[in-house]
Structure formats: structure tokens, C-alpha cells
Amino acid sequence: VRGNLTGAKFFVGESYPMLYEFSTQYLKEQPPGGGMAVISGPKLQLRTWTMLFDKTSSFNIKITPRGRDTMTYPYTGFEVGDQEISLGELALRTSKFRVPVMAQNIEAKIEITSSSPLPCRLQSAEWEGFYHTRAARL
């Protein structure tokens, strides 16, 4: 670090690759006896994946459907038309980032990666999908 940084705000850190792979997503229900049970059998098609985060600089969402190429969606903290952050400033955002999945739940691998030394504070994930069954449950 060069120069006098008295009173300056800055981050010090070591760059390392962060990787988180989500487990397979299933619909669940509460059976009469209590607890939670996976609804198996019907087709669940994941449509979108949304990451919610707090004071985060950047990360990537990687979607790999079985038999297809991996799609990487980078989040950089900058949004088109944003007037709060100028070029050259550190962009730490509290927001959400939605990407397309378009794959069946059992055939989609969803990963979050980051190699930035800046903060990456992931809070939760949400998915939206289509559920189709051809039979009635008794």
C-alpha cells in the first residue's frame, strides 16, 4: 500500500475462488403426520433463478443443463442508467439478480462463483418454475 491512507476507506483481502453449488430443487409439502415430504413424480421445469444479496460487488451465476453448454451470467454491481455510482467508484449493491434456467430441476446444475477480493454477501435464492402432473393425488 502506497501513500498516506489516513481516514480513507479501503478493502484489504486476498483473492481466492469462491464456489457454491446448489442442491437439486424440489417441491415439498407438509403431510398429515407432520414434517416435510418431497413431491416426487411430476415434472418441475425451472424457469428463472434469483439471487438476493447485500452490499455485494460482483459474482457469477453458472447454469449447466444436462447435455448443454454452461451459461455464465456475471453480476458486476453496475446497472444501466444508475446515477448513484460514477465510473471508477466501488459498486456495492443490495439488490437481486435474476437469470434464466430453462431446464428440468433434476437436470440443472446451478453454481455461484466469485474470485473478487471485494465483498460478496449472498442472502438467499429463489426460483420460479412450471409444475406439471398428469395424475391427481389422493
Residue ranges, per PLM feature:
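Beta-sheet repeat architectures centered on beta-propellers
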Residues: 1-138
